[in-house]
């Protein structure tokens, strides 16, 4: 797992991520006392590398990551991504390109209008997830190992769910 705290490391990671076909992305933020959410963490997974980007680090410029968000060749996976996309839009004035929302996909597949992430992971992957860190203060540093585990687990499950939804079914494999 990579914990990215500076621009140099972010540039290196993003050059690798630019070669990815699919990225699952999630954010942690605080929205209690502000109109716009305060971005506290970005989690990314490409099927091989688990990455946490710390936007609160004083030595980081997120522009290399923002280029990835606007790369039309890379599928970006979110679950109920409205707030994540809102955060990125407020920072860049651009909407990420080529977005796949697992909540919308689940609705189309009959899971209900707003199936929660925990329920979706349980129903599709048969896995239980620990959501106890969801409402912790994500702006405090250093993050605990429990917070980091929670954050990175979210994007790994997202990736797996997307692969199941987008893989051809057995009867389609002959086409």
PLM ranges: what are they?
Residues 165-170:
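Conserved small/polar residues in nucleotide/adenosyl-binding loops
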């Amino acid at each position: 797992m990579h914990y990215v705290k500076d621009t140099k490391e972010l540039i290196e990671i993003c050059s690798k991520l630019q070669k990815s076909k699919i990225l699952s992305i999630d954010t942690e933020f605080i929205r209690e006392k502000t109109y716009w959410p305060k971005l506290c963490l970005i989690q990314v997974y490409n099927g091989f590398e688990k990455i946490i980007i710390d936007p609160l680090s004083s030595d980081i410029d997120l522009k290399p990551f923002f280029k990835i968000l606007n790369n039309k060749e890379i599928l970006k996976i979110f679950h109920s991504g409205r707030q994540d996309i809102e955060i990125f839009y407020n920072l860049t004035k651009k909407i990420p390109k080529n977005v796949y929302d697992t909540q919308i996909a689940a609705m189309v597949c009959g899971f209900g209008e707003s199936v929660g992430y925990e329920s979706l992971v349980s129903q599709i992957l048969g896995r239980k997830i620990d959501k106890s860190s969801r409402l912790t203060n994500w702006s405090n540093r250093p993050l605990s190992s429990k917070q980091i585990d929670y954050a990175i687990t979210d994007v790994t499950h997202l990736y797996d769910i997307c692969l199941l939804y987008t893989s051809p079914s057995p009867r389609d494999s002959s086409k």
